[in-house]
Amino acid sequence: MLLITSMLVLWMQLSQVNGQQVMQIPQYQHVQEGEDFTTYCNSSTTLSNIQWYKQRPGGHPVFLIQLVKSGEVKKQKRLTFQFGEAKKNSSLHITATQTTDVGTYFCAG
């Protein structure tokens, strides 16, 4: 019996908006299909809001969500977004990754 596993490559990008540097950690990550994945955005200053985007290979960035409130948590199916209490960081968690999750994820503040 042949077992085939898919390797997902999820990229993150560094963003700079209005002079604020927002850094994502890790910058890229290989994930096996079915594994969970988490990436973080950290800002040097307090953000009034943060947006998350996804760009599929060869495609344009697609808006996913905007977080405004301190400590806010929002879910979209297998994706969970969180805005830190101090409004200087955010996280994106994908549960049980699928091949449709392949792409570049980035945040902007």
UniProtKB/Swiss-Prot annotation:
This is T cell receptor alpha variable 25. It comes from the Eukaryota. The keyword Transmembrane helix does not apply. PROSITE patterns: IG_LIKE. It is found in: Cell membrane. GO terms for cellular component: T cell receptor complex. The keyword Cell membrane applies. Disulfide bonds join C41-C107. Residues 1-19 form the signal peptide. V region of the variable domain of T cell receptor (TR) alpha chain that participates in the antigen recognition. Alpha-beta T cell receptors are antigen specific receptors which are essential to the immune response and are present on the cell surface of T lymphocytes. Recognize peptide-major histocompatibility (MH) (pMH) complexes that are displayed by antigen presenting cells (APC), a prerequisite for efficient T cell adaptive immunity against pathogens. It comes from Homo sapiens (Human). Keywords: Adaptive immunity, Cell membrane, Disulfide bond, Glycoprotein, Immunity, Immunoglobulin domain, Membrane, Receptor, Signal, T cell receptor. Residues 20-109 form the Ig-like domain.
